UniProtKB/Swiss-Prot annotation:
One of its GO terms (cellular component) is cytoplasm. Belongs to the UPF0235 family. This is UPF0235 protein Pmen_4153. Coiled coil: none annotated. HAMAP family: UPF0235. It holds the Pfam family DUF167. It comes from Ectopseudomonas mendocina (strain ymp) (Pseudomonas mendocina). The lineage of its organism: Bacteria, Pseudomonadati, Pseudomonadota, Gammaproteobacteria, Pseudomonadales. InterPro entries: DUF167, YggU-like_sf.
Length: 98
């Protein structure tokens, strides 16, 4: 199992979120999930909104192209990124067919 899979042109990511970190960053793998550290606190959806904005910037898409599929109230989240324009340097992550 991998922390990502392609669904057509959409990238599905399984993440482990660490809110209230000192900086926003990809932090390697946490089991079979991509660990992401965010500065936002886990209150009133702030960490989720911050996560969507962070991923949109990292993958070169508009915020509307990143959606939370599951894990709204959990550290374990599944996200969909529609047609990413670029891929950050992450373990094993490549565009399909390459």
């Amino acid at each position: 199992m991998s922390y990502f899979r392609w669904d057509g042109e959409d990238l599905i990511l399984d993440c482990h979120l660490q809110p209230k970190a000192s900086k926003d960053e990809f932090a390697g793998l946490h089991g079979e999930r991509l660990k992401i550290r965010l500065t936002a606190p886990p209150v009133e959806g702030k960490a989720n909104a911050h996560l969507l904005a962070f991923l949109a910037k990292a993958f070169g898409v508009a915020k509307a192209q990143v959606s939370l599929e599951s894990g709204e109230l959990n550290r374990h989240k599944r996200l969909r990124i529609h047609a990413p324009q670029r891929l950050p340097t992450l373990p094993g992550l490549i565009f399909p067919g390459k």
